[in-house]
């Protein structure tokens, strides 16, 4: 992924202090603890005035859901910030979390992406697996503003000349 981003001219900076999102498992046991963990990562990015780019659909979903919860509830954001202040952090809510697929479609564009291909993949069939976190809940993922996100992997596959094969597990957890 880093090579793809570099080829597309996108500079990346690793957030050394970022932790794993908890993959939704932590949130099932203790949602506030999971949200503190994820908003902490967003606060690090916010301090650097950077968005979060992820290739993991679970990370995308978990961070986006945590961000959505604090942005729609200022009192909850204050609770989270009271925990973050112990580390000298505060989250104001300006960090955008974007999956690499969304960057390819929304920021680069499929036409520009196609210009970077060395070979077309005609004759190949791929069965895309999104998982559940990158497609649900849609209100936390910006689908109303960007409806193409629901089909982003299909769109990237088709742009290579390959064909998409649907299967029932495409968006299952």
State the predicted function of each range.
Residues 1-173:
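Iron-sulfur cluster-binding electron-transfer modules in prokaryotic oxidoreductases
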């Amino acid at each position: 992924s880093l090579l793809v981003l570099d080829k597309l001219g996108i500079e990346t900076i690793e957030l050394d202090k970022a932790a794993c999102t908890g993959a939704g498992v932590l949130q099932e046991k203790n949602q506030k603890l999971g949200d503190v963990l994820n908003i902490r990562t967003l606060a690090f990015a916010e301090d650097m005035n950077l968005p979060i780019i992820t290739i993991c659909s679970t990370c995308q979903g978990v961070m986006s859901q945590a961000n959505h919860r604090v942005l729609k509830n200022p009192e909850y954001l204050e609770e989270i910030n009271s925990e973050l202040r112990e580390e000298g952090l505060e989250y104001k809510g300006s960090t955008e979390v974007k999956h690499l697929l969304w960057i390819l479609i929304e920021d680069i564009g499929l036409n520009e992406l196609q210009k970077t291909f060395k070979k077309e993949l005609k004759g190949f069939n791929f069965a895309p697996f999104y998982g559940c976190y990158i497609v649900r809940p849609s209100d936390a993922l910006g689908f109303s503003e960007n409806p193409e996100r629901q089909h982003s992997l299909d769109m990237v596959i088709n742009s290579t000349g390959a064909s998409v094969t649907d299967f029932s597990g495409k968006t299952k957890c």
